[in-house]
Amino acid sequence: PHVVQPFDADSSHVVLYSLGNFVSNQRRRYCDGGLVAEIEAVRHPDGRMSYSLEAVPVWVAMPGYRVVPSEVGDTMALPEAYALFREDVAEVLGGAYK
């Protein structure tokens, strides 16, 4: 759906419903960024699996469709829409947001 949505993750599974946009010309609210997700899967000696998830917000900066990780974006002069995107992602992800 081109927008960041909540995800489910615990030690037994990870479900990502929507990571938003990575590279897109959609400049309206909720569609101007996304998430990069890193999932680590570990198989234990007893056969049990465990998972961990890190999701990093990214902003699609113009011109040139540059994908900017949030920690870099915080140091740049980006449009006001960037700050709004950060707020929206924090609201959607709640405690899972860094």
Predicted regions and their residues:
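Conserved beta-sheet core of the metallophosphoesterase superfamily
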Residues: 1-37
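A short C-terminal boundary segment appended to hydrolase-like catalytic domains
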Residues: 32, 36-98
